[in-house]
């Protein structure tokens, strides 16, 4: 891994035995092994996270490219339809509230005159209107208390 041969490793072990002594050498070797294991696990976790992010970025890039390609294909179809008005255009994906040209007007991209909208019925909270009696008192709004904050308009 680090390019250390067996003889170099044996030399490091001999120096550690002389410096630490025979009582503390097994504990030091165990601690060094634990630290090396933690470093390896941390390195592998970071490497996996980077690979996962690269994979996610690649997937995002691929989806974006596919979306752009589909938009380009749709634009080509629309351009081809403008060049050849006798062919009908079918969109790649359904679009809500899209205006479809009718068969008589496929040669032009202009909208005709707008038709007047149908009159809207009067809005009411009740389903049926009740006739107002002359004896029925007209409801009055409650008097505003001056100790309360003003009402919003």
Swiss-Prot record:
Where does the chain cross the membrane?
Answer: 1-21
Give the main localization category: membrane
What does the UniProt keyword field contain? Cell inner membrane, Cell membrane, Membrane, Protein transport, Translocation, Transmembrane, Transmembrane helix, Transport
Compartments where found: Cell inner membrane
Pfam families noted in UniProt = TatA_B_E
* Record region (Disordered): 78-153
Subunit and partners: The Tat system comprises two distinct complexes: a TatABC complex, containing multiple copies of TatA, TatB and TatC subunits, and a separate TatA complex, containing only TatA subunits. Substrates initially bind to the TatABC complex, which probably triggers association of the separate TatA complex to form the active translocon.
For this chain, the family text in UniProt reads: Belongs to the TatB family.
* Identification of the protein by name: Sec-independent protein translocase protein TatB
Q: Which organism is it from?
A: Pseudomonas savastanoi pv. phaseolicola (strain 1448A / Race 6) (Pseudomonas syringae pv. phaseolicola (strain 1448A / Race 6))
- Name the gene: tatB
